Amino acid sequence: MSNKNYDAIKAHYAGSDARDLAAMMAPITNGTAWTEMAGFPYAGTYVGPDAVIDGVFKRIGEDWDGYTFTLEKLVDGGATIVGIGTYSGIYRKTGKKMSARVVHVWEMQDGSALSFEQFTDTRLVAAAMG
């Protein structure tokens, strides 16, 4: 039996791989609370798709070359979906490469994201920026 929450997040990551922002934002609603970890350069909670795009994705695009999230495992917990993988990229201002393990925790309802929370090694990201 298919889980539409799992399928929605699987499609989000497929959109990320294809650099398709619309596909990435499909499960994000006006009420989705998207939290970037404290210590991360874009730390904070952004509510709704416009805030996520402006506060996170546009800034990543401006600051990094080749920034990617490589999904290695997607865990179907029903209403909780967990993506495990690696961030990588080159910080434009320093030319330094970064690779950091990351976990994304999604709380879902009927294929829509209620919340997203990121956990990553912010020190590795900061080292590339400094």
Region spans (language model):
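Pocket-edge positions in alpha/beta enzyme catalytic cores
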Residues: 1, 44-45, 117
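Short, low-complexity N-terminal intrinsically disordered segments enriched in polar/charged residues
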Residues: 1-30, 127-130
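A beta-strand edge to alpha-helix "cap/lid" segment located at domain peripheries
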Residues: 4, 57-130
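Short, mixed-charge, low-aromatic patches
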Residues: 7-17, 41-44, 60-64, 84-86
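Hydrophobic pocket/interface hotspot
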Residues: 9-12, 24-25, 32, 48, ...
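Short, electropositive, low-hydrophobicity segments enriched in small/polar residues
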Residues: 19, 23, 52, 89, ...
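A solvent-exposed, acidic/Ser-Thr-rich amphipathic alpha-helical stretch
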Residues: 23, 27-79
